[in-house]
Amino acid sequence: WQLGWVAANDGNVSVKLPDGNFLVTPTGISKSFITPEKLVIIDKDMNIVEAEGNYKPSSEIKMHMRCYTERDDVGAVVHAHPPTATGYAVAGKSLDEYSMIETVIAIGSIPLTPYGTPSTNEVPEAIAPYLAEHDVLLLQNHGALTVGCDLITAYYRMETLELFAKISLNAHLLGGAKEIPKEQIDKLLYLRDNYYHVTGKHPGYKHYNIS
């Protein structure tokens, strides 16, 4: 919320705990008002293990749990509405391009997943096919989702996404982004694996749905 990625009760965060349970932000409360004791602990079946008062887990918890189910390496999930990245999602446009070195190394191309009604199984079903190769997703007409081995990694990926969206928008206003050639992409991916040792998944040089 401090960066303007969410407003009011928007957005949600979850973290996998060492005992196999999950720490989740509560539903119906602004992120600016959340204190540690207001966080909710649930089990893998989304049953509440520990919660203060009447606090319940985020209404988007099904989306979070699908990430953990699909990927054993996921330790945290962040969902937010960063304005520029979400602008792409609302416009029906992906960020499925290879035009900035740092983004290629850190997260790769960013697909736009199909529309799904929040809080239902539609969103988990929509994102599932993309999780095998992506740590960062745009949710059509909704926002953005990032996963990571831990919370700081998932957060950094959301930050990287929003900055890239801003740069991409500026590039398109200037006539269009210039894509990096495949042979250069291969070199960057080598650096990702052998120098930076970036965790998570990467689609390689692959396009899903440029629009």
Sequence positions of predicted segments:
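Glycine-rich flexible loops
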Residues: W1-S211
